[in-house]
A protein has these predicted regions:
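Short alpha-helix
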Residues: 111-134
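Conserved SAM-binding strand-loop segment of SAM-dependent methyltransferases
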Residues: 23-40
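Conserved class I S-adenosyl-L-methionine
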Residues: 77-102
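A short glycine-rich, Lys/Arg-flanked "PGG" loop and its adjoining helix->strand segment in the class I
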Residues: 62-77
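Conserved SAM/SAH-binding beta-strand->alpha-helix loop
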Residues: 10-12
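Acceptor-substrate binding/catalytic loop of class I
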Residues: 82, 101-119
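A conserved beta-strand element that flanks and buttresses the S-adenosyl-L-methionine
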Residues: 50
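Short, small-residue-biased leader/transition segments that mark boundaries at the very start
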Residues: 1-6
Length: 163
């Protein structure tokens, strides 16, 4: 039997997610804490590992990639999403989202921690992952619509397979 397990460092995020899951009657195992704390008992345990909008907030992104790779089974899928590091991403993700539109609390992001796709791809490949797809994610704050596309200037998603 397959089970969904979600681990997060934020008790607020887990509480919010639990409320959403309960409304949808979805059975999810929520765990508060660091992904690294799942090792070694969950080594190569998961079919799919996602690390969404988190890697730009940790002190050692490469260590997080390594942990995610270690948690994933052979031939499993891994997804990372994060923010590119360039002037456009600074303008959109920090100035726009945090200071003009107030979509996020001020200080949520540090520009220096943004990661270029080439940097994340290198970390992933160094940890036994084969890149399958790089996709851009865009958001229109006026229409509140999200979409996927080729533009990776600001937000992007990478899918990889564990060798």
């Amino acid at each position: 039997q397959r089970q969904m397990c979600i681990r997060d460092r934020s008790d607020v995020a887990i509480h919010t997610a639990k409320n959403h899951a309960n409304k949808e009657n979805i059975d999810i195992n929520y765990i508060l804490g660091e992904a690294e704390n799942l090792l070694p008992e969950k080594n190569e345990h998961f079919d799919v590992v996602t690390c969404l909008e988190a890697i730009e907030h940790v002190p050692d992104p490469n260590q997080l990639v390594k942990t995610c790779s270690n948690l994933c089974k052979k031939n499993g899928d891994i997804f990372f999403s994060t923010i590119n590091r360039n002037p456009k991403s600074f303008l959109f993700a920090i100035v726009g989202a945090e200071y003009i539109l107030n979509l996020l609390p001020k200080g949520t992001h540090e520009y220096e921690k943004f990661i270029k796709p080439s940097e994340l791809i290198q970390m992933m490949e160094n940890n036994g992952l084969t890149i399958k797809e790089l996709t851009g994610m865009s958001y229109n704050p006026l229409t509140k619509n999200y979409w996927l596309g080729k533009n990776v200037d600001v937000n992007y998603l990478i899918h990889a397979k564990k060798i």
